[in-house]
Structure formats: structure tokens, C-alpha cells
């Protein structure tokens, strides 16, 4: 609906939204996962900025609902927020309260909380914090999770050496059914670094064996996978998609 760095969105064109959704569905696209602007901070202490984030996110949900009504599956992904010194407990509570306000106005599209690397005062730095936020949301059906592979490793979960253990923990704390999308990124700095620096596929600390495991996981492989790696050349993402597809065991 708007630039990831911008604050304003264009007015909704119902006919255009319907045509877009119908075309996606007709051409066999999977779920549409929109990334909300990075400037949203539902956990912030600045009341004006927090009010803006709530209002803008509600507007985004309203806009995307017009596409969902065509039958196209749609989600909006957000970075949960940063508590900026208020403490994670307060930050998680504010995020839940903000989402409840969003859903009072618009509830036609599920909001996905992205797993975070734990940089600075980020909330959502572990599965427990995400679960706390989700448990504070009144309409549980309106909230899910985006699993960012780089962020999860950077947050301290050993996806390389204990893939099954991490997935079990994710299932116990949040529930695998709540995971609706995957951001597929390698990691420059790796386990427990809290750096959030993406690397191209196979060129970081996760490595090809991990991605082989991921794309052959019977549950995770069914989810939409979105690359957020650096485009080194115009062919980078095409080549990475081909690489990932080549890892799928027939």
C-alpha cells in the first residue's frame, strides 16, 4: 500500500484492487505478503508516532482487504517494534494493545509479526516475546508470524546444528500453524550475533545444507518464501530462486 520507508499511501482504487487480486488468482500466484513500512513502531514511547503507526497499519489492512475479497490470499508483515528503553514487557504489551486498536477498525487481513534478530531494543527477539504479543491480541485469528531465517539464527537459535530442535521449540511456543511466510536470507554474522545483516543464499553462516533442509521440510516448504538478499546483479534473485529450487529433492 505504501513505500517501506514512506508514510503516505495512495487512495484506494476499488476497481484496481479487485482487478489486481483477480489477476494474481487467475495466474496461479500464491499468497501475497506485503511488508509494512519500517517506520511503524507499535512499541514506542512517542505517543504521536505510535498513534500514526496504529492508524496507518489499520489503513493498510483496509486497503489489502479489498484484494483479499477477490479470493486472493493476503497478509501484511510488520516488524513488531522497539521498546526504546521502556523494557520488553512494556513493549510487548503496547504492541498487543496497538494491534487490538488496529483490529477494532479493520480485521480483514492477518498481520504477521516478523521474527527479529534482537538488535537494540527490538521486541520479538525470541519466540516467547512473539507469543506474549500474540496472546495479548483479542482476536487470535488476526495475527501470525513470518519466519526470517537470518533473524532467527542471529537471535540465538541454532538452525544449522539443531534444526529439528528449533522447529520443535517454535511449534511448542507459537505453533507451526501460525507461521504463514518465510523470509529466506543467509546471515553474515551468524548465531547469537543480534546483527541482522543478510547474506546471499549459501554465502553466509547458514549455508547450503540448512537451505536444503528448509526447502525439503514438509511443513515449511508449503509456505511462501520471500528473498530479501542483496541484488548483486540483475540476475541475483533469479539465480537464487533457481538455486533453491535445485535443492528440492524429487
In which residue ranges do the predicted regions lie?
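Alpha-helix N-cap and loop-to-helix initiation/capping positions
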Residues: 8-16, 45-56, 86-97, 121-129, ...
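Histidine-acidic metal/acid-base catalytic patches
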Residues: 131-250
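N-terminal pre-domain/capping segments
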Residues: 1-36, 40, 44-59, 250
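Alpha-helix-loop-beta-strand connector modules within alpha/beta enzyme cores
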Residues: 14-34, 95-108, 131-137, 205-217
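Active-site acidic/histidine proton-transfer and metal-coordination neighborhood
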Residues: 25, 41-144
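Hydrophobic residues within beta-strands of alpha/beta enzymes
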Residues: 32, 75-76, 111, 182, ...
Amino acid at each position: 500500500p505504501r513505500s517501506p520507508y514512506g508514510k503516505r499511501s495512495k487512495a484506494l482504487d476499488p476497481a484496481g484492487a479487485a482487478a489486481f487480486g483477480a489477476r494474481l488468482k487467475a495466474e496461479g500466484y500464491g499468497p501475497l505478503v506485503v511488508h509494512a513500512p519500517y517506520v511503524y513502531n507499535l512499541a514506542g514511547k512517542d505517543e504521536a508516532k505510535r498513534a500514526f503507526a496504529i492508524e496507518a497499519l489499520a489503513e493498510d489492512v483496509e486497503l489489502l482487504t479489498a484484494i483479499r475479497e477477490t479470493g486472493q490470499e493476503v497478509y501484511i508483515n510488520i516488524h513488531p517494534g522497539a521498546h526504546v528503553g521502556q523494557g520488553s514487557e512494556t513493549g510487548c504489551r503496547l504492541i498487543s494493545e496497538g494491534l487490538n486498536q488496529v483490529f477494532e477498525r479493520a480485521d480483514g487481513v492477518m498481520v504477521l509479526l516478523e521474527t527479529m534478530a534482537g538488535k537494540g531494543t527490538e521486541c520479538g527477539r525470541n519466540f516467547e516475546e512473539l507469543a506474549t504479543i500474540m496472546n495479548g491480541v483479542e482476536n487470535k485469528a488476526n495475527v501470525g508470524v513470518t519466519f526470517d531465517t537470518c533473524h532467527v539464527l542471529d537471535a540465538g537459535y541454532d538452525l544449522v546444528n539443531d534444526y529439528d530442535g528449533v522447529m520443535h521449540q517454535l511449534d511448542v511456543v507459537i505453533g507451526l500453524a501460525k507461521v504463514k511466510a518465510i523470509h529466506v536470507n543467509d546471515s553474515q554474522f551468524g548465531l547469537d550475533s543480534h546483527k541482522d545483516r543478510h547474506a546471499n543464499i549459501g554465502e553466509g553462516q547458514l549455508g547450503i545444507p540448512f537451505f536444503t533442509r528448509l526447502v525439503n521440510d514438509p511443513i515449511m516448504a508449503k509456505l511462501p518464501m520471500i528473498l530479501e538478499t542483496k541484488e548483486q546483479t540483475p540476475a541475483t534473485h533469479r539465480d537464487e530462486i533457481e538455486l533453491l529450487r535445485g535443492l528440492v529433492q524429487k
